[in-house]
Amino acid sequence: WRGKTIVNLSRAFLDTNGAHQEADVTLEVPNRQGNLFEKTEVADVKGKWLDMLSDLNVCSQKGLVERFDGSIGAGSVFMPYGGKYQLTETQAMVAKLPVLKGRTDTVTMMSYGFDPELSSWSPYHGAVYAVVSSVAKIVAAGGDYSRIRFTFQEYFRRMNENPSRWSQPFSALLGAY
């Protein structure tokens, strides 16, 4: 601050959250029932199609997106919808980095890849596909895969001393790795 160091903590200390922690893990294998990778036969294709369109993970979110102004600030590169009729959802956020003077062509890109149905069945498979999906979206938007940096947001039930409780975050970390 004003040329003086106020706090100087090592990165190694910050990575531990201040204390060494260990936990036992009992790994839970996903059920064979509900396996999303198994081929299923559908008798009523039209009914299944309409059912899929009503799924919150598939249906249009245009009404929600229109509540936000994507043109605020001069940094936005992609609008929320693109294409000839402005109806195609963009799969990545791209914004120029702010600079004090002059122009910049440097951007930051962000995407996502979470599949709640797959992750509910298997946190491991959900994490694998989350990484692959988010990388594919960045590359499709013009990003360089070798410069991608990851951040993972995780939401698991409260952990305690029960080793089976640690199965979900442990499996997800293995999948993301």
Per-segment meaning from a language model:
Residues 1-177:
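Glycine/proline-enriched, intrinsically flexible loops and inter-domain linkers
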